[in-house]
Amino acid sequence: MDSIMEPYVADLLADDITASMVELLSGDGGAAQMDVGVLDAYLRAIGALPAHPAAPGADLAAAAEVESMASNDDTNGNWDTKVDAKVPSAFLPPPPGFPPLPVPALADEPVYAAPVDEGDAIRAFMQQLEWSEQYNGDDDAPAPDDSMASRPQLCAPYDDDIDANLRAMEKDAAERPSPDYLDTVHNGQISAASRASLVAWMGRLTHRYELAAGTLHRAVSYFDRFLSARALPSYTEHQLSLVGATAVYTAAKYEDQGTVFKLDAREIASYGEFASAQEVLAMEREMMAALGYRLGGPNAETFVEHFTRYSKGKEELRVQRLARHIADRSLESYGCLGYLPSVVAAAVISIARWTLNPPGALPWSSELHELTGYSSQDISSCVLTVLNTQ
């Protein structure tokens, strides 16, 4: 090892703090397994060794190595956060015993501390969300990485009419649940936590029978609208499960008429351990009447599909898939009932973009503002509600 490394490195390895740091970075094998070139680059980057003469491209290579080492720091490997947020490793805290690495300044770009818990992660995201549209409008900012800027020109002739129709339907009071029905209709006999557990159970039911995409969102909408209109004769687990299972059964038939070939009232009764298929059918009739037979209103999944319908390329399709998943999880949040489905859809797309962090992407952009009709400020409150559900 000494024949490979310069004397400066050998001297530093003799120091207790440095030796412990090498062990931390290299794993259980200690310094003997450490990549000497990587260690040498790191020590020079923090000023512990004199710098090598500059060579074309050398700074970028060294910076990449240092970033890789910093990202392996165990002190940042155990974030207790449910948001899989990626923070550039150059912004992470330094290893124990070492000074911070110099971060190249980016014009007008704020530097965020690495989140160390869920609260910090959410605050970092909200700061970036607030800043993203301002940065996107800066003449010196990089061009948006997505293709949304050209989407208005690619839209089908009827897109504007479809969008207007969806927006009108989502604002129709007859198609929306009450945002406070647990208190106003049921006098607190159903808690938000009980509702969340039941929605999760409904999700397992849709997966068990591989029901059509969109079934869960429509079923939860039916469930909330029904409970917004009717008090229950009892608030037992059996009664609530009957309402939830019937909502899934009704929504599944709306989404795909072929559902009747793999799922019927007898199967629902068996899955939910209800008395009989007749109990399910009776609840279905009661639910349809309470909903006024209005079954086709848009939901958050509808708008996620609508806003991402022109997604193309690997990164955009990944954002679309994750946004759908987050939208599914948001159904468990009672607080999301206070927002229009299009706002929830915009919020989950923003969270998905930030979580996956494709190169150059920001949580929001002027193109997304134009496409959805919402600014980052418009969706910020909903974003917080969704993040606190994950």
From Swiss-Prot:
Segments for region (Disordered): 135-154
Keywords tagged on the record: Cell cycle, Cell division, Cyclin
GO molecular function: cyclin-dependent protein serine/threonine kinase regulator activity
InterPro entries per UniProt: Cyclin, Cyclin-like_dom, Cyclin-like_sf, Cyclin_C-dom, Cyclin_N, Cyclins_cyclin-box
A Gene Ontology cellular-component term: nucleus
Keyword Translocase attached: no
GO biological process, one term: G1/S transition of mitotic cell cycle
Xref: PANTHER family: CYCLINS
Family indicated by similarity: Belongs to the cyclin family. Cyclin F subfamily.
Name this polypeptide is given: Putative cyclin-F2-1
Protein's organism: Oryza sativa subsp. japonica
